[in-house]
Regions:
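Short loop/turn microsegments at loop-to-beta-strand junctions
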Residues: 34, 59, 136, 142-144
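A short beta-strand-turn-helix
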Residues: 37-59
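Bacterial N-terminal signal peptides that target proteins for export
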Residues: 1-13
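Bacterial N-terminal signal peptides
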Residues: 10-22
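Thiol-/selenol-based redox modules, centered on thioredoxin-like
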Residues: 140-179
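Short active-site neighborhood of thiol/selenol oxidoreductases, capturing the structured segment around
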Residues: 51-74
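Cleaved targeting-peptide boundary
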Residues: 22-32
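Structural microenvironment flanking redox-active thiols in thiol-disulfide oxidoreductases
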Residues: 74-114, 126-128
C-alpha cells in the first residue's frame, strides 16, 4: 500500500474516533468531586443537601438527569428506587440532581423516586463544576452518573442520554468499593 493511502486511512480512523467520542466531557475518574450545598427533597419534604455530609456515610451515587417527569427521567428514577436495597447492601447512597425547582422535586421524590432516595436542585455552578450541561439544551443537565468514594474522588462516570445502563453501572461500581 502506498504511503499516502496509509496516511489517509490513519487520518480517517483518527477522525472517526474523535467523532465517536461523547459530546459531553464529564469529570474524569480520579478527579476530586466538587463540593456543593443545595436544597432537595426526600419523600416530599425539603432538606439541605451538602456533598461532604453525604460522603461521611460512605460512597455516593450522584446522578444527573435532564428533567423531572419526562419519560426517561421518570423510568430512571423508578429503576434507582427499585434497586435501593442493593445500593444499601453495597453501602452506597443515591442522590438524583437536575435543574428542576424545589416544588417539582418534592413531587418527583414521592411519585418517581417512591420516597426511596433524595433528589436535589443542581445550581448553574454545580452543573458547570460537574461538567453536565446538556449541549442541546443548556438550561438542562446531561444524563451523567458519578460514583464518588467517601474521600471525595470520582471512581466511576457514565454519561449517556439513554437511562437504561445507569443503575447497573453505578451499582456495580458501588459494590466494587465494598470489596
Amino acid at each position: 500500500m502506498p504511503r499516502r493511502a496509509g496516511l489517509r486511512i490513519h487520518i480517517g480512523l483518527l477522525a472517526g474516533l474523535l467523532l465517536a467520542a461523547p459530546l459531553s466531557a464529564a469529570l474524569p475518574v480520579g478527579a476530586r468531586a466538587p463540593d456543593f450545598s443545595t436544597t432537595g427533597a426526600l419523600a416530599g419534604k425539603p432538606f439541605t443537601l451538602h456533598l461532604k455530609d453525604q460522603l461521611r456515610h460512605g460512597p455516593l451515587v450522584l446522578y444527573f438527569y435532564p428533567k423531572a417527569f419526562t419519560q426517561g427521567c421518570t423510568l430512571e428514577a423508578k429503576a434507582f428506587a427499585d434497586a435501593m436495597p442493593e445500593f444499601r447492601k453495597a453501602g452506597a447512597r443515591v442522590v438524583g440532581m437536575s435543574a428542576d425547582d424545589l416544588d417539582t422535586l418534592k413531587r418527583f421524590s414521592t411519585e418517581a423516586c417512591r420516597n426511596k432516595f433524595p433528589v436535589a436542585t443542581a445550581s448553574p455552578a454545580t452543573i458547570k463544576a460537574y461538567d453536565v450541561v446538556l449541549k442541546q439544551k443548556p438550561e438542562l443537565t446531561d444524563r451523567t452518573s458519578y460514583v464518588i468514594d467517601r474521600k471525595g474522588r470520582v471512581v466511576m462516570v457514565h454519561s449517556d442520554l439513554d437511562w437504561k445502563d445507569h443503575v447497573a453501572k453505578t451499582l456495580a461500581a458501588g459494590e466494587a468499593l465494598k470489596r
